[in-house]
């Protein structure tokens, strides 16, 4: 009997697929089938897959013209014969050889329809929890009801009863982006509860994954967000709904705003999302709606005027510092560099937790600039949850010229979204 069918969509992953496959083949549970779906790769991916098929009897290859990973996974679901289904991205891997066996045994012991554990990111050779919301990390083993499940992300760290998925006809929407969270929420909604394990069951590679959102991808991204909000609200999945709303204003909102004026469907999606937000607000949850119509037009004009004032003002400053040396900090530095603004340094509260140099620029402690604080402007380039705290710290240290730059405004300044 095949215990687990592992579904792996593959598109131009020649650099990573071997590590992924070796991770799967090293698993201590032997009763598995590996379904590899080539999504019209143009590099050596298919050649590598065929080499594995030749030497491994449990490897099956499916092929399709380039249509996206969601459609590829749906092919895998239909072809699967295992008791459970697992999903893996072709550039990711399992943390240990007994990971799948541990998850499978736990699922059997508990009778779980959906069972899995925590996740860990892998970025530039470093294992880290940075960038993961709390729903990706569990503090103990146990059941979590659909109402309390805290996120719509991280579907790949779970296994799913195959007959459940197939009989309920739960498939990935045919979106180019954000197609997995709607699948995940639909599965949880139908299962009613999920068994979650404290241990890490999946390693997610992050360093090379970036999407430049052209209109088609942006619309699909917005559709996926809308679908998740509709599903979670319909099913009473309040924790997942609120988690998604908490990150809506940033990259997601900027992505929608940039295309709303030229795409009527994007306008409609924004309106549909706002209907969910207003419904959520009946529960006295303070979530700001997205801008739409004339308000959005005026906002976009104001943002461009603010961009001009900011750049002009920074050109006059003696010293420009960027607080934060992470993803946001690097994006802000690149934006300012393209516009002719010279950054003196990245600054942080504790240099021992950061590299000494990031992207060729020194990382220094903010305290090094206290004596020169009147000559410095500090741009706060962190995620929103930290900005107010950092602003207060800077105020207490005597810095007065402080500019918190939100993710949403940065993307609108740039006129593009890359996530």
Question: How would you name each of these model-derived features?
Answer:
Residues 12-26:
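Short, well-formed alpha-helical segments that are part of the catalytic scaffolds
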Residues 23, 38-47:
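A conserved acidic beta->alpha catalytic loop
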Residues 31-40, 60-65, 89-90:
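Short beta-strand/loop segment that forms part of the nucleotide-sugar
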Residues 64-80, 90:
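Glycine-rich, basic loop-to-helix element that forms the pyrophosphate-binding segment
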Residues 69, 90-195, 204-218, 260:
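Donor-binding/catalytic cores of nucleotide-activated saccharide
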Residues 85:
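Short aromatic/hydrophobic "clamp" motif used to bind/position activated sugar donors
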Residues 205-319, 325-338, 380, 419:
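C-terminal subregions of glycosyltransferases and related glycan-biosynthesis enzymes
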Residues 292-419:
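Hydrophobic, well-ordered beta-alpha structural blocks that scaffold small-molecule cofactor pockets
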């Amino acid at each position: 009997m095949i215990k687990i069918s592992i579904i792996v969509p593959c598109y131009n992953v020649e650099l990573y697929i071997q590590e992924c496959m070796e991770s799967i083949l090293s698993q201590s549970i032997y009763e598995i089938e590996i379904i590899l779906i080539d999504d019209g790769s143009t590099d050596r991916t298919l050649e590598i897959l065929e080499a594995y098929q030749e030497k491994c009897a449990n490897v099956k290859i499916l092929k399709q013209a380039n249509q996206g990973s969601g459609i590829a996974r749906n092919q895998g679901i239909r072809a699967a014969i295992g008791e459970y289904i697992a999903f893996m991205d072709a550039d990711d891997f399992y943390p240990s050889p007994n990971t799948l066996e541990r998850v499978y045994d736990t699922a059997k012991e508990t009778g779980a329809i959906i069972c899995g554990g925590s996740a860990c990111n892998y970025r530039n050779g470093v294992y880290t929890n940075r960038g993961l919301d709390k729903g990706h990390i569990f503090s103990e083993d146990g059941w979590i009801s659909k109402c309390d499940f805290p996120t719509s992300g991280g579907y790949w760290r779970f296994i799913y009863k195959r007959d459940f998925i197939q009989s309920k006809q739960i498939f990935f929407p045919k979106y180019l982006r954000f197609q997995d969270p709607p699948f995940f929420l639909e599965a949880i909604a139908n299962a009613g509860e999920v068994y979650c394990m404290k241990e890490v069951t999946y390693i997610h590679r992050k360093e090379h994954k970036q999407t430049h959102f052209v209109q088609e991808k942006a619309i699909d991204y917005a559709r996926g967000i809308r679908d998740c909000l509709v599903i979670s609200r319909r099913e009473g999945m309040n924790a997942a709904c609120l988690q998604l709303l908490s990150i809506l204003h940033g990259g997601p909102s900027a992505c929608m705003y940039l295309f709303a004026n030229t795409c009527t469907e994007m306008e409609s999606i924004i309106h549909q999302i706002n209907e969910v937000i207003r419904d959520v607000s009946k529960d006295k949850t303070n979530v700001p709606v997205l801008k739409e119509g004339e308000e959005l037009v005026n906002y976009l004009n104001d943002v461009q005027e603010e961009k001009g004032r900011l750049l002009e003002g920074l050109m006059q400053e003696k010293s420009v510092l960027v607080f934060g040396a992470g993803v946001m900090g690097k994006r802000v530095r690149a934006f300012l560099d393209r516009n002719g603004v010279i950054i003196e340094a990245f600054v942080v509260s504790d240099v021992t937790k950061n590299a000494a140099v990031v992207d060729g620029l020194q990382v220094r402690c903010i305290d090094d600039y206290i004596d020169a604080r009147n000559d410095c402007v500090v741009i706060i380039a962190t995620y929103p949850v930290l900005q107010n705290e950092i602003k207060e710290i800077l105020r207490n240290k005597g810095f007065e010229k402080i500019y918190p730059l939100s993710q949403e405004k940065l993307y609108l300044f740039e006129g593009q979204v890359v996530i």
